[in-house]
Amino acid sequence: MLVTGHSGQSLEWIAANSDGWIYYPRNVRVQEVITEQWRKILQATSSDDKPFSQSFYIDLVEDKDALPIPIHLGYRLGRNALLEILCELHSIGVNHVVFNLKYGSRPAAEVLDEIGEYVLPHFLPQNPFSNSICHQYLA
């Protein structure tokens, strides 16, 4: 069971009673503080490492180099900017990102095909973080 937000519970309760935590999208620096708090609480409660996840609204445009423009709880952006943001999130301890295409301007199937072909391969287990495209974004 993953807890979304705080669901009326303390972070200690979530760490002890859930299989992970889904939180809301935040600025990367703010999210880094939140993921650090999550890991500290897990250690303090002697809990196993549990995933930190977040939602992320995207409008993936056809221009792969389009810079991010803020939308509600996410961005309108090209796939290269999406990759860069996902690399940043990965580097601060976000384990899973839940994409929401609600504000998308393209057909969902087309967006999912593009993500599957150009984005997800960089995050497969056989493609370690240090050898992936993330290395160039975070260098």
Predicted segments with their positions:
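Active-site-adjacent structural elements that line small-molecule/cofactor binding pockets in enzymes
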Residues: 1-139
